[in-house]
Amino acid sequence: MSLLCKFGYDEQYFNDLLLKAVSSDSTLFSDPKMMNDLLQIIMNGGKRIRPLFVLLAADLKENVNKQEIYTAAVAIELMHVASLIHDDIIDESTTRHNVTTLHEQYSLTVGVHLGNFVLNKSLELFSEFKIPKLHQEIAVVMNNLCLGELNQQHNHFNFDLSFDDYINKSYQKTFSFFSFSCHINFHSSLFILLS
């Protein structure tokens, strides 16, 4: 059971939207097993903290459109999953949540492309929101994720890393994403969209 269910949110609705977002192009996969393996990684899920933050923040607003806010939560989760697929490649991980990683099952190249595919699905969902400021913030979050990973790689085994540099890396890789998850609902134009 994910945190979504524990906090009283409609986990089944979330999962249905998540599945629909990714499997809409399932006929494009020449290898049905590959699509099933990708879906297993996505649906096996973790705690779903980022989507939970989207939904919790939405509760601060009255008359929120359920489909729109859950779509934003799914888009956030897909962006996170894409980053995990890529992280598994960088870290040479063989499993995640007791499931063999995609690059381990197929190849590094396939793993990268599957991560990119999931990221694209996230961006497709975000594109439904016609809010330029939101799109700019998505670009900032993605930039921060990339810079944080590059900084981490650059400082690998750097035992003289300053506390400020560590905090900056953590902000880039983690906190900026959490922050975005919390305040995605607070764009004035998004309020109008979700009302």
What are these regions (language model features)?
Residues 81, 125, 184:
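Short alpha-helical functional segments enriched in proximate histidine and acidic residues
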Residues 25-28, 43-47, 129-195:
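All-alpha helical catalytic cores of prenyl diphosphate-utilizing isoprenoid enzymes
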Residues 53, 122, 148:
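Residue-level signal for inorganic ion chemistry
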Residues 49-50, 74-77, 110-118, 173-181:
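Catalytic-loop motifs flanking and including active-site residues across diverse enzymes
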Residues 1-79, 85, 89-104, 140, ...:
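Conserved N-terminal diphosphate/IPP-binding helix and adjacent helical/loop segment
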Residues 96-119, 160-174:
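Divalent-cation-assisted or electrostatically stabilized phosphate/pyrophosphate-binding catalytic cores
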Residues 117-133:
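Primarily interfacial, aromatic-capped hydrophobic alpha-helices that serve as membrane anchors
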